[in-house]
């Protein structure tokens, strides 16, 4: 029992000599497995760290014990010791110290904020012309883009319009050309019909001789006459030479052509002697196409047709 008391007494002396260590030993930091010496190195934020003894022992530079020795010597030395104690408290409480540091940094930042604002304003004022210069070309760069888009759109629209107009012009020209060809064909058909009409009185004048030479009936010749203008009108619309295609027989296609031209010339000049020959040839060519009966009669008409020319 005496040994135990001695141990407890020794412990009490130790606690009296080093209350900070006893407080640290009784601190719940041991639950983490940290010893007293480790607390100095790690600087663990324990509730005992707030005590002045712990603060003094936690100093690693040894300024705290020196301050304790020099307390009766001078009060001025206590001020740096207090400052160091404050630093030790900040070190022991890293979270609070960080918050204090942030607050301290924020405090000088606040007075410097007007200066920063002034500097920012001056920088903005100095950079404002540059920014304005940079902003000035930016709208100019945007406007040409818009102009380019507009011009491109207008160009495309104009091109489409021109192409559409060109197509209209081309279609109009094609229609005019077709109309001109149709008018020319109509004129040729009218001229051919006029020549045949002019040749009709010639046929009436010399119809007896022509019918006697052909040996055909007058009714067949009269029926062939209305068929003649129909045949030349159709080929006239297709080709300029309507009279050459009006004849059904391919062998006699070349022979009546000069006769037809002679008939046109006779209608223009006025001689009635050549007109009966051309009309006889046309009637002879149209007769076989109109009815199959006069086909054998066409054979004797073939030799006198060139002789009449």
Swiss-Prot record:
List the effects observed when the gene is inactivated: Most of deletion mutant embryos display an abnormal brain development with defects including open cranial neural tubes (exencephaly), open spinal neural tubes (spina bifida) and tail flexion, and the pups die within several hours after birth.
Q: What induces it?
A: By lipopolysaccharides (LPS).
- What is the tissue specificity? Brain, spleen, less in kidney and heart, and very low levels in liver.
Residues recorded as bearing Phosphoserine in the entry:
26-27, 29, 46, 63, 74, 113, 122, 128, 138, 140-141, 152, 156, 160, 163, 171, 246, 291
Q: Where along the chain is composition biased (Low complexity)?
A: 73-82, 89-98, 109-142, 190-203, 256-290
- Stretches of Basic residues bias are at 145-157
Q: Which positions does the record annotate as the modified residue N6-acetyllysine?
A: 165
Phosphoprotein listed as a keyword: yes
The main location is membrane
**GO process annotations (BP):** actin crosslink formation; actin filament bundle assembly; apoptotic process; mitochondrion organization; neural tube development; neurogenesis; response to endoplasmic reticulum stress
Q: What are the boundaries of the region Calmodulin-binding (PSD)?
A: 145-169
Where, per UniProt, does this protein localize?
A: Cell membrane; Cytoplasm, Cytoskeleton; Cytoplasm
Q: Which UniProt keywords apply?
A: Acetylation, Actin-binding, Calmodulin-binding, Cell membrane, Cytoplasm, Cytoskeleton, Lipoprotein, Membrane, Myristate, Phosphoprotein
Query: Where are the compositionally biased (Pro residues) regions?
Result: 291-309
Q: For this protein, what post-translational modification is recorded in UniProt?
A: Acetylated at Lys-165 by KAT5; acetylation is required for its subsequent phosphorylation. Deacetylated by SIRT2. Phosphorylation by PKC displaces MARCKS from the membrane. It also inhibits the F-actin cross-linking activity. PKC-mediated phosphorylation increases 4 to 5-fold upon TNF-alpha or LPS induction.
Q: List the disulfide bonds.
A: none
Which residue ranges are recorded for the region named Disordered? 1-309
Q: How does it assemble?
A: Interacts with CDC42. Interacts with GTP-bound form of RAB10. Interacts with calmodulin/CALM1.
Q: What is this protein called?
A: Myristoylated alanine-rich C-kinase substrate
Biological source species: Mus musculus (Mouse)
